[in-house]
Amino acid sequence: MGIKPSYIKNFGLELIGRYGDRFTPDFDENKHQVSELTVIDSKRVRNRIAGFITRKVNTKKHL
């Protein structure tokens, strides 16, 4: 999807820093976690943050 905006990255990294153990390599599960942990009205922004977190978790797993 291209380069993510900085607010998506910053918010995603903050969530990973605070609640890193709650996120999994599964996008749908992360989507529900982001909904639980935040108050984001926009489905598109929520999905972008969940996608960023999923990508980070999957990358971390391969290292």
Swiss-Prot record:
One of its GO terms (cellular component) is cytosol. Signal peptide: none annotated. Keywords: Ribonucleoprotein, Ribosomal protein. The keyword Nucleotidyltransferase does not apply. It comes from the Archaea. GO terms for biological process: translation. GO terms for molecular function: structural constituent of ribosome. SUPFAM superfamilies: Rps17e-like. Belongs to the eukaryotic ribosomal protein eS17 family. This is Small ribosomal subunit protein eS17. It comes from Methanosphaerula palustris (strain ATCC BAA-1556 / DSM 19958 / E1-9c). The gene is rps17e.
